């Protein structure tokens, strides 16, 4: 019986039957014929000797016909001699019994093959295609009987109507099954040791490949306190650079100065300077472009709704599309408040909460950049509108940034008509409420730095010196 492992691979059996020489069983080999060793199981054609061989006395009433025909008579009709150059020559013996020739009244091989045969498997398409069809047309029919251990003679004595060469092919099947089961058992043992084994199909290509072997990590970091191990030397070399902080690839753009460990990181960074965005979102109606594949991957989660980063804090259960968002969210659970308002000193756990506080209580601050810059750029940490009373004709509005702008100041000169007055933070001498200041109007002043632009709402008067004088009078009255 064909094993379950070979049920989906019948081409192996066909290849074995067509290309393998099967030794004859005991009782079929002549003791005096030393040159006859095996029969080639190549596809049999209509002109071959096997197609014209029939067992004698093939009548419905014969019972022991197999015993009446000696095996020597069968083998004498087909004798294979091996020549000196290794070629097989087929020589017919002089004593050829005429009863082995097929008569017109003899039943066909297709009629001899019955579904109730006791054989384990029968190549039904052998007879359907003239015993010479290709491997892809072979069909293996499995019997309901499970007894496949009967030898050649017992199977032939049970049903002698099936030709003897089909019985030999059945023995070839049983031999192949036993050999394949042994190989599968061997592969199972070696597969447990981590080896990659697979059983190839008839065309020589692997059909099902096993799991990839897990390579041994032999490279271990020698830095104290680091237990990282690596498989590839390139990864190990990159890891050692992180310990030495060896950033040998520096951005050549003016005013940038960023450095990287590997050249590929620098190439990706240069896209931010030249505006190259090779990764595009192909969702309908979107079409956004990004500089890195990681940014595109994070953007696609907006369309799919995927949020793979889950907060593991007890009772929270929030999930995020990006790991950076999860990292910022974890600050809420830790109780840390690293973001401080530079005007009043109030601290916040999120930078967005601090920015909302500044826009609401200290100044009207907005961002007029693009949407992507608005999501990634940090707004101003704090600002102050200063006034120099000693120099009334040289007023200066200064905005100090301590976030992504690197602490540089944004200065606006030639603003003689602009006074540094805020909603709540006034200069020491201007303690009078803004509602009592005459002829005061709102103006928006735009300040730019790099890729960001800011609009600051300030108060102006028709005569700035008059506003300062009123502030002095108010101070004297108090």
From Swiss-Prot:
Zn(2+) 1 binds at residues 221, 226, 239, 243. GO terms for cellular component: chromosome; nucleus. GO terms for molecular function: DNA-binding transcription factor activity; RNA polymerase II cis-regulatory region sequence-specific DNA binding; zinc ion binding. Zn(2+) 2 binds at residues 251, 256, 269, 273. Disruption phenotype: Mice are viable and healthy, but display reduced expression of Chd4, leading to rerepression of fetal hemoglobin genes Hbg1 and Hbg2. Residues 84-113, 187-214 are annotated as: Disordered. Keywords: Activator, Chromosome, DNA-binding, Glycoprotein, Metal-binding, Nucleus, Repeat, Transcription, Transcription regulation, Ubl conjugation, Zinc, Zinc-finger. It is found in: Nucleus; Chromosome. It comes from the Eukaryota. Residues 103-113 have a biased composition (Polar residues). PANTHER family: ZINC FINGER PROTEIN, ZINC FINGER PROTEIN 410. Interacts with CDKN2A/p14ARF. This is Zinc finger protein 410.
């Amino acid at each position: 019986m064909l094993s379950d492992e070979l049920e989906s691979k019948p081409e192996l059996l066909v290849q074995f039957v067509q290309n393998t020489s099967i030794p004859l069983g005991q009782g079929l080999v002549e003791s005096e014929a030393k040159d006859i060793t095996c029969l080639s199981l190549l596809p049999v054609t209509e002109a071959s000797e096997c197609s014209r061989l029939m067992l004698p006395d093939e009548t419905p009433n014969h019972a022991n016909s197999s015993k009446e025909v000696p095996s020597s008579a069968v083998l004498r009709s087909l004798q294979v001699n091996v020549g000196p150059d290794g070629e097989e020559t087929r020589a017919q013996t002089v004593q050829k019994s005429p009863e082995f020739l097929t008569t017109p009244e003899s039943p066909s091989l297709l009629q001899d093959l019955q579904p109730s045969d006791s054989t384990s498997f029968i190549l039904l398409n052998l007879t359907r295609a003239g015993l010479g069809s290709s491997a892809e047309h072979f069909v293996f029919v499995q019997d309901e009987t499970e007894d496949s251990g009967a030898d050649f003679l017992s199977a032939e004595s049970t049903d002698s109507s099936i030709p003897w060469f089909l019985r030999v092919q059945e023995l070839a099947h049983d031999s192949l099954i036993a050999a394949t089961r042994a190989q599968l058992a061997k592969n199972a043992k070696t597969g447990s040791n981590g080896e990659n084994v697979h059983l190839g199909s008839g065309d020589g290509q692997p059909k099902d490949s096993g799991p990839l072997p897990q390579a041994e990590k032999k490279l271990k970091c020698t830095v104290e306190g680091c237990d990282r191990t690596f498989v590839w030397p390139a990864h190990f070399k990159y890891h050692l650079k992180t310990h030495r902080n060896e950033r040998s690839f520096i951005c050549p753009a003016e005013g940038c100065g960023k450095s990287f460990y590997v050249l590929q990181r620098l190439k990706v960074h240069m896209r931010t300077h030249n505006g190259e965005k090779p990764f595009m979102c192909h969702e309908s109606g979107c079409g956004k472009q990004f500089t890195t594949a990681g940014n595109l991957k994070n953007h696609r989660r907006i369309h799919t709704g995927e949020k793979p980063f889950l907060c593991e804090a007890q009772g929270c259960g929030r999930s995020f599309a990006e790991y950076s968002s999860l990292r910022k969210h974890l600050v809420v659970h830790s109780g840390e408040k690293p973001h401080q308002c530079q005007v009043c000193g109030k601290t916040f756990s999120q930078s967005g909460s601090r920015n909302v506080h500044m826009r609401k209580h200290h100044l009207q601050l907005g961002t007029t950049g693009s949407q992507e810059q608005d999501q990634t750029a940090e707004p101003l940490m704090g600002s102050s509108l200063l006034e120099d009373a000693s120099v009334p004709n040289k007023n200066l509005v200064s905005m100090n940034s301590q976030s992504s702008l690197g602490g540089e100041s944004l200065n606006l000169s030639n603003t003689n008509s602009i006074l540094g007055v805020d909603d709540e933070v006034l200069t020491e001498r201007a303690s009078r409420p803004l509602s009592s200041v005459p002829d005061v109007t709102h103006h928006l002043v735009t300040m730019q730095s790099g890729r960001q632009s800011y609009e600051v709402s300030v108060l102006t008067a028709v005569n700035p010196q008059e506003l300062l004088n009123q502030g002095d009078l108010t101070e004297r009255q108090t």
